[in-house]
Amino acid sequence: MSLDIAKYPTLALAENPEELRMLPKESLPKLCDELRQYLLTCVSRSSGHFASGLGVVELTVALHYVYNTPFDHLIWDVGHQAYPHKILTGRRDRISTIRQKDGLHPFPWRGESEYDVLSVGHSSTSISAGLGMAVAAEREGKGRRTVCVIGDGAITAGMAFEAMSHAGDIHSDMLVILNDNGMSISENVGGLNNHLAQLLSGKLYASLREGGKKAFSALPPIKDLLKRTEEHLKGMVVPSTLFEELGFNYIGPVDGHDVHTLTQTLKNMRDLKSPQLLHIMTKKGKGYAPAEKDPIGWHAVPKFDPASGTLPKSQSSLPTYSKIFGEWLCETAAKDSKLMAVTPAMREGSGMVRFSREYPQQYFDVAIAEQHAVTFAAGLAIGGYKPVVAIYSTFLQRAYDQLIHDVAIQNLPVLFAIDRGGLVGADGQTHQGAFDLSFMRCIPNMVIMAPSDENECRQMLYTGYHHNGPAAVRYPRGNGTSAVLEPLEMLPIGKGVLRREGEKIAILCFGTLLAQAQLAAENLNATLVDMRFVKPLDEELVLEMAAKHQVLVTVEENAIMGGAGSGVNELLMAKRRWVPVLNIGLPDLFVPQGEQDEMRSELGLDAAGIQRQIEAWLA
C-alpha cells in the first residue's frame, strides 16, 4: 500500500530531517497537519499504534528541525509514539508495513535506521541509556547532543528516577522531554506559561543563574535568598520542585501542540549545560476526535474506517484468555474478600476492567512498577491476604529478583497470572513471552502451570489461588478453543493427563499448542500427553511414557533452552533412562514480529511443523 504523496505537498518536501531543516519555519504548522493526516490514513489501512503518535507530531517536527539528527542522539522511550519519527526519517513509504512480518519494526530499532539510536519496547529505559550516551558524547568532544523523550506514565518507573538521580549527580549535558499527555502532573498550561518557559530557557537567564550561583556560593544567606527567589518565579509555572531536587533545570510546562513555541524553546535549551528537563503538555490522539475521546481504546488499533470513527469488533465469538482470567477474578472476589488483584499499568490488556470497577477496594494498579508490584504482593500475602499479580510474561522479566527474593524464598502464597506467554505477534522481539518457563523453572518453591485450553486455565487459576505457596499460571495472547467450562476444583499438583494412546512416539505437550500437537499425533499415531505442570513435573508419567515408547517429543511455546522440555531431559538423565528426546519450542533467537499463526508456521510450531520436525528427526 502506498499513498499519493502529492496530496501532502509540504510533507513531500521532508523525506528526511536534512530536508525538513531546509523548510521555512512558517511552513511547520502545515507540515504538522499533513503529517498527522498521513499517519491517520496509513494506520487506518494497515493497523498499528495510533493515539500516541498523533500526540507527538509537533514535538517530532520540532526536534528534527532544531537538532542535527542523526549526529545528535534522539531517544524515544517505549516507542509507541515513534511513527511520526519514522515517517520523517526516510521510512515514509514503508510505514504501512509497520508491525507486519518483514516490515518496519513497531518500535525504534537500531538495525533499521541510523536515526534509531536505541532499540526499545519496554518503558522507562531512555534516560539511563541517554545518560550513558551523554557521557560518551562528552568524552568524544564533538558537540553531540542527547535528547530523551519520555511519557508521564513511563517516568513514574523507578529506573527513570534512578537515572535522573545519577544524571543530576554527575551534571551531564542532556535534555529530557517529559511528554505529559495524561494531565497527571499539571494542568497549568497557557500563554503565560509558554512565555515564561521561553524566558527561563533562554541563554541570558541561564548565564545569570549559573553566574549568580558561583558569585554567591560562599555567602549562604544570599545563596538561599536567590534560590527562594528563583523558586518563587518558577512557582508560577512549575508544578513541583521534584526535578530540581534531582539536579535538573526544569522548564515548562509548554503547549506540546504549538510547534513554533516548541521550536523556539528547544533552540534556547539546545546549548544549555547540565541536565535539563522540558515539560510539555500534549493530547494523546490529537487531531482525531474519537482518539482524543478514548485514547486508551485507540492506543493500538486494527484497520478501521476513519470516517466512521469506530473500531471494528472482534470477529471471534470465543473469549480471550485475558477475559477468562478477568471473569475468574470477579467470580473469586465475589466469594473471597481476601483476594487482592495487582497490575503494573496493564488493566485493559490483562482483562481487569470489570474487576477494577466492581471491586475497587481489592484492585491495585501500581503503575509501571513491576518490581514494586511483586514485592507489594508479597507484603499483602504476609498480611494475610491472597494477592494475584496479573502481568505480561515479558514484563515479569523486570521483577525477577523480587520473584525470587521477596516471594519464593519466603514461600508466600502469591499467584502470578502470566498473560502473553509465548508468541505475541506484531510487537516483536521485545514483547515475545519466550523465557518465563525457563527463568521460573529453576526457582525453588514455585508451582508452574501451562493450560491447554480456557477450561484448564480456570482450573489452574483456582488451584494456584488456593495453593499455599507461590504459583504461576501461564497463558497466551488470543482466544480460547471453545472448551466447555467446568465447575472449579483443585487439580492434583504435578499431574498430567493422557489425551491419546499411540505407538512408538509419545508427545508431551506443555500449554496451548496441544491442539496442534493433537493433529500431529493423529497423523503419526503417537501418544499425546497434556503435561499441565511444568513444575513440579509429573515424573511418574514421564517415566511411564519413556518405558512404553521408543522416543519422546516435548512441545512448548517457550525457549527450548531451560524450558519444560529441558526438565524432561534432566529427569531422564537423572534416572538413567536412555530414551531419545526431541525438544520442540522456540529457537535460540529473539523472534521478530509477525502474526502469531504466521510465526508459528515459520518456526515449525503449527501441526504441520510439529509433524515435519518429528519426521525429519526420525529419518
Curated annotation (Swiss-Prot):
UniProtKB keywords: Isoprene biosynthesis, Magnesium, Metal-binding, Thiamine biosynthesis, Thiamine pyrophosphate, Transferase
Biological processes per GO annotation: 1-deoxy-D-xylulose 5-phosphate biosynthetic process; isopentenyl diphosphate biosynthetic process, methylerythritol 4-phosphate pathway; terpenoid biosynthetic process; thiamine biosynthetic process
Pfam families according to UniProt: DXP_synthase_N, Transket_pyr, Transketolase_C
Catalytic activity reported: D-glyceraldehyde 3-phosphate + pyruvate + H(+) = 1-deoxy-D-xylulose 5-phosphate + CO2
Gene Ontology molecular functions: 1-deoxy-D-xylulose-5-phosphate synthase activity; magnesium ion binding; thiamine pyrophosphate binding
GO terms for cellular component: cytosol
EC number(s) recorded for this UniProt protein: 2.2.1.7
Cofactor: Mg(2+); thiamine diphosphate
Oxidoreductase keyword on record: no
Cofactor, free-text remark: Binds 1 Mg(2+) ion per subunit.
Enzyme class, broadest EC rank: transferase
Pathway: Metabolic intermediate biosynthesis; 1-deoxy-D-xylulose 5-phosphate biosynthesis; 1-deoxy-D-xylulose 5-phosphate from D-glyceraldehyde 3-phosphate and pyruvate: step 1/1
CDD domains given in the database record: TPP_DXS, TPP_PYR_DXS_TK_like
Residues that hold Mg(2+) according to the record: 152, 181
Oligomeric and partner information: Homodimer.
Record function comment: Catalyzes the acyloin condensation reaction between C atoms 2 and 3 of pyruvate and glyceraldehyde 3-phosphate to yield 1-deoxy-D-xylulose-5-phosphate (DXP).
Protein name (database record): 1-deoxy-D-xylulose-5-phosphate synthase
UniProt organism field: Yersinia pestis
